[in-house]
Regions:
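Conserved alpha-helix/loop element of class I SAM-dependent methyltransferases that forms part
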Residues: 1-18
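Class I SAM-dependent methyltransferase SAM/SAH-binding core
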Residues: 20-22, 28-74
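Acceptor-substrate binding/catalytic loop of class I
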Residues: 125-141
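Conserved beta-strand signature within the Rossmann-like core of class I S-adenosyl-L-methionine
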Residues: 112-120
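Core SAM-dependent methyltransferase catalytic element
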Residues: 163-178
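A short glycine-rich, Lys/Arg-flanked "PGG" loop and its adjoining helix->strand segment in the class I
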Residues: 99-111
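Conserved S-adenosyl-L-methionine
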Residues: 152-161
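A conserved beta-strand element that flanks and buttresses the S-adenosyl-L-methionine
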Residues: 87
């Protein structure tokens, strides 16, 4: 829902409509739900067959693929796909290197395509591995990774992306484009 509101704010001046949407780490389809009505086509990628089965049951996706995100993005067919919007909600917390995945996403975006993602963050610079085995990415690191991938930052907002033991976990909600 946080990703949806961030993308919606970017499109407040014009009607929000996307030809094709790709949901990376789609899980059960929770992040895709608010976007479905604004897309002509929606695909989802996830490592877990159980999650994909739940997503399939929701009827949101035109295509579901069992794959690791970077492997999927690097396939020749996907490089030619040209997605209008790529979503990655609660996915990049499992990656220490954002630059590689952002470069791969930049390759599959259509002209004027956008990427909306969330990351956990921390007050310092760089990347921090937490006790939870989830990575927290500093704001400067996120900005540098976007620039290295050739993506332009459109919006960056601080928000609690989840709670851990009853305590809100600070995150960033990012929208970028090519």
């Amino acid at each position: 829902e946080l990703l949806f509101h961030a993308v919606e704010a970017v499109h407040a001046v014009r009607r929000m409509k996307f030809g094709s949407v790709l949901d990376l780490g789609c899980g059960t389809g929770l992040a895709a739900l608010p976007f479905r009505q604004f897309s002509d086509w929606m695909g989802g990628v996830d490592l877990s067959p159980a999650m994909l089965m739940q997503a399939r049951g929701k009827g949101l996706y035109d295509r579901l693929i069992e794959s690791e995100v970077l492997a999927f993005l690097s396939s020749e067919a996907e490089i030619k796909a040209g997605y209008h919007l790529v979503l990655a909600a609660d996915v990049f917390m499992y990656l220490d290197d954002l630059t590689s995945v952002l470069k791969a996403i930049a390759q599959v975006l259509a002209s004027s395509g956008q990427l909306a993602f969330s990351v956990e963050t921390h007050a310092g610079d760089g990347v921090l591995l937490r006790e939870t085995l989830r990575y927290a990415h500093g704001e400067a690191h996120v900005r540098a990774a976007l620039a290295a991938a050739g993506l332009k930052l459109i919006s960056l907002d601080f928000a609690s992306t989840r709670t851990e033991k009853g305590v809100p976990v600070l995150g960033l909600i990012v929208v970028a484009g090519n």
